[in-house]
């Protein structure tokens, strides 16, 4: 749960008549996402005179590990055949378009692209020396899947 945007007022010496807070919520499971969404929607004001409105809700399902394991194991086999080190895996609670595909029952792998760090930040970077092997892995995985 990360408060990512806050907008209020237009001068430093005036109490704003409106404040808007946007919150980014990511989760490893739909149950956790629903629990946090419910907790936020049931928040009560500390000041009885305060007026507030809570709108919105989650805009994508989580990418649950159970929906990715079979395809991950296949990618790990292909990586081993290419002589790559063992593929890592992580549940990150991220938000990609793959979340929708996985929720619809498709097998999804996320994170097969460039290797780097600082995702979505000003200091984001890509290790270009990894692009060739990552491309080879993706190419070999697609060929393996097409051979079924």
Language model: regions and residue ranges:
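Metal-dependent amide/peptide-bond hydrolase catalytic core
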Residues: 1-148
């Amino acid at each position: 749960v990360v408060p990512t945007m806050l907008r209020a007022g237009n001068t430093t010496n005036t109490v704003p008549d409106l404040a808007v807070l946007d919150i980014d919520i990511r989760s490893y499971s739909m149950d956790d996402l629903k629990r946090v969404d419910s907790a936020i929607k049931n928040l009560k004001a500390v000041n009885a005179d305060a007026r507030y409105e809570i709108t919105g809700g989650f805009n994508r399902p989580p990418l649950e590990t159970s929906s990715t394991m079979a395809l991950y194991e296949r990618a790990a086999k292909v990586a081993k055949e290419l002589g790559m080190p063992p593929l890592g895996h992580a549940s990150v609670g991220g938000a990609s378009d793959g979340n929708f595909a996985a929720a619809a029952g498709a097998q999804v792998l996320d994170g097969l692209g460039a290797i780097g760090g600082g995702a979505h930040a000003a200091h984001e970077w890509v290790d270009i020396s990894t692009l060739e092997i990552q491309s080879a892995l993706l190419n070999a995985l697609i060929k393996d899947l097409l051979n079924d």
